[in-house]
Amino acid sequence: MAKKSMIEREKKRIKLNNKYTPKRNTLLQAYRQTEDFQSRLDIHSKIQKLPRNSAKNRIRNRCWKTGRPRGFYRDFGVSRHVLREMAHSCLLPGVTKSSW
């Protein structure tokens, strides 16, 4: 189980990302379309003034049950340990244990 503070930090990052994504996208689009060097610097400084945790690449996928950041399966939203437990207890429809 991950620390509660880490899980809350991720929730805060997701909230900040949702809040600042439109503003960040408009600034980035203006930055790409501008050819003047000075105006590019101005736009770049505005982008840098946005909160660091509002960037999308700061968000880490975490298991919804345990908060584990590694061994994460996107299709199910859980870590490998939880996926195995849920598959064995038939909580995931259509998932079967492979045998060959």
Swiss-Prot record:
It comes from Trieres chinensis. It holds the Pfam family Ribosomal_S14. Binds 16S rRNA, required for the assembly of 30S particles. Part of the 30S ribosomal subunit. InterPro entries: Ribosomal_uS14, Ribosomal_uS14_bac/plastid, Ribosomal_uS14_CS. NCBIfam families: PRK08881.1. The gene is rps14. GO terms for biological process: translation. One of its GO terms (molecular function) is structural constituent of ribosome. HAMAP family: Ribosomal_uS14_1. Belongs to the universal ribosomal protein uS14 family. Signal peptide: none annotated. One of its GO terms (cellular component) is small ribosomal subunit. This is Small ribosomal subunit protein uS14c.
